[in-house]
């Protein structure tokens, strides 16, 4: 059996730019891509915390250290500057590998300051 697992996650990054006329994609600070193990041109899913929109695109690199999160092309209609996003990439693997797998999660606050990195999503409690 093949399972699709969370590979990398940027949690609560803030949109710094939305460019409807750029050819597509989501530009992400290279430091952020590395923190979550997301490659340039990799498929990503984006979840907009502010408006509930969920959409797919691909990652491109933005200048390292710029803290840029730019939603481009048609996807720019799904996010506004200042919106908080969760950006995820996924990987397919065998059931056996999935049971040993740990995603790369990067948590952000404020103006896209990386707060911490983790290899799991915390257990939700009541």
Curated annotation (Swiss-Prot):
Cellular localization per UniProt: Cytoplasm
InterPro entries xrefs: Asp_de-COase-like_dom_sf (IPR009010), Asp_decarbox (IPR003190)
Catalytic-site annotation from UniProt: 25 (schiff-base intermediate with substrate), 58 (proton donor)
Binding, substrate: 57, 73-75
SUPFAM superfamilies: ADC-like (SSF50692)
Gene Ontology CC: cytosol
Enzyme Commission number, as recorded: 4.1.1.11
Domain of life: Bacteria
Cofactor requirements of the protein: pyruvate
Reaction equations catalysed: L-aspartate + H(+) = beta-alanine + CO2
Cofactor details (free text): Binds 1 pyruvoyl group covalently per subunit.
Similarity comment: family membership: Belongs to the PanD family.
NCBIfam families: panD
Subunit structure, interactors included: Heterooctamer of four alpha and four beta subunits.
Protein's recorded name: Aspartate 1-decarboxylase
Name of the gene: panD
